[in-house]
Structure formats: C-alpha cells, structure tokens
C-alpha cells in the first residue's frame, strides 16, 4: 500500500504524534523527532502539484490556513488539488477544526470553493465546549477500517454519549438559528469598525478574522494591552504580525462594538 502523505508548508494540524508529523513547521517538530516518515510538502496556493504522485496515499490541508495567517485558497487551488488527487488515486483530507461549523459563513468552509473532500476532519466548536473530534467520510472508506485491524480497538473515549449529545445539540443549534449566515453580517461590522493606520490589512472569512499589523511588536502589544482591558485576542503561530479575532458565533453587535473600541483605544496608545 501507499504511505506517502502530502501536507502544506506552514500548516498546523495538532500536537499529537500523527498530527504533528504532517504539520509544516519544523521548529515546533524538532524536539519530538523521529515522527512519521514519508511526509512531503507543497506550497499553499501553488500551481505546482507534482509532489502529489502515484505513491501518495493522501493529501491533508486546512481549507483556510490558520497559523500561517488566515490564508484563503486562491485561483481554484482546492479544485486543482482535488483533481490531482483523483488523477493519481489519492484521498483529499480537509482539516476544518477551525473553519468548520459556521465560522466562515457556511456550515463548512469548503462549500465556498465548490469542492468536497474525501475525508473531513472536525473538532473544537463541534462539542460546544466539550472535547470532541470527528472524521467524516463515505461508507466505503469507513468499511476499510473494519478489519486488519478494526479501528474500534484504538479509542478509549470515542463515542462518549455525553459528548456525542453535546455535539448533536451544538450542530442542531447552529443550523436551526442560521448562525452561519449571521457571521457575514458580523464580519462586515468588524471590518467597518477596525480601521486604523497601524492595521495594514484585515483578512477575514466570516468570524475568522486576522488583523495584520505593521510589525511583530505592534501585534504583541495589542494582544497584551487588550487583555489588560478585558478583551481576549491571540497571536497566530507563524505570522507574527497577525492578531487573531475568532469570537463565538453568538457574539452580539454591541459586544463587537465594545471589543473594537478597546482595540482602537489600545492602538491609539501605541
């Protein structure tokens, strides 16, 4: 069988052995080697997909790169990857732990880009505050996990009834209350308010927002000083000029205005 996995440079998929192996950030991986072998990388949004070849078992990508700076796919990049995977017989995996469950304005971010992955990974918001992870794929793929060996033997807490109930109810509320659609209106409000000379760019897809500052130090001061004023922001892993804004989908317009007021007051003090 095939063992080669293709991931993207500056990707982040987690901190456990397998997910760290496919993350594209060497300085965070160095202390934990040896990791999984036969991992190769492509540039996100690059047209050269030759690394995906007949030895490739799967390609794993974030639909929107998070730690790299909230980088959205351009020029039909995901469609090209999907077609390349189909050509060589590899599976396309999309990691939507950050982008899924309504955050980008659709239930799943891949819906913006006219493709469907072979395997979809979910977590974080799916549990509504409870720890949960999910792998979603078609039945024929799941059937492959029924033998040699059966997948079920490797999980201690898999399918926990309380967490499964929390996940079901969270998904139901997101769909019933149309929270995905409402994120676009809230995104527009953020972008309308967050105008300042120290902000060079606002990257956003729904309520997945990154403020790109003039330099690392400005970003660092904004996060720390905002926390002192009661507002939680955060950094991104690789893009040090960026400040993350990823509030709950239920955030109100008045809360958005209050938060933006704090951000602008901090920037005025820098």
Language-model regions: role of each:
Residues 1-270:
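Conserved N-terminal phosphate-binding loop of PLP-dependent enzymes in the Aspartate aminotransferase
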């Amino acid at each position: 069988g095939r063992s080669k996995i293709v991931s993207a440079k500056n990707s982040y998929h987690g901190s456990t052995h397998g997910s760290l192996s496919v993350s594209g950030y060497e300085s965070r991986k160095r202390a934990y080697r040896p990791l999984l072998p036969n991992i190769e990388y492509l540039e996100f949004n690059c047209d050269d997909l030759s690394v995906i070849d007949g030895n490739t078992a799967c390609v794993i990508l974030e639909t929107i790169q998070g730690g790299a700076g909230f980088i959205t796919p351009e020029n039909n990049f995901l469609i090209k990857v999907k077609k390349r995977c189909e050509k060589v017989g590899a599976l396309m995996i999309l990691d939507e732990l950050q982008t899924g469950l309504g955050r980008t304005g659709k239930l799943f971010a891949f819906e913006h880009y006219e493709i469907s992955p072979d395997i979809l990974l979910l977590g974080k918001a799916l549990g509504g505050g409870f720890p949960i992870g999910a792998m979603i794929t078609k039945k024929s793929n799941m059937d492959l996990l029924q033998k040699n060996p059966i997948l079920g033997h490797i999980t201690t807490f898999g399918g926990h009834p309380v967490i499964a109930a929390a996940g079901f109810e969270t998904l139901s509320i997101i769909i019933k209350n149309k929270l995905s659609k409402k994120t676009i209106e809230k995104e527009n409000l953020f972008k309308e308010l967050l105008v300042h000379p120290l902000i060079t760019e606002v990257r956003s897809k729904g309520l997945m927002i990154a403020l790109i500052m003039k330099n690392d130090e400005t970003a660092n001061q904004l996060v720390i000083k905002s926390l002192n004023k009661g507002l939680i922001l955060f950094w991104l892993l690789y893009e040090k000029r960026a400040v993350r804004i990823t509030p709950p989908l239920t955030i109100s317009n008045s809360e958005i205005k209050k938060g933006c007021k704090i951000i602008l007051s901090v920037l005025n003090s820098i």
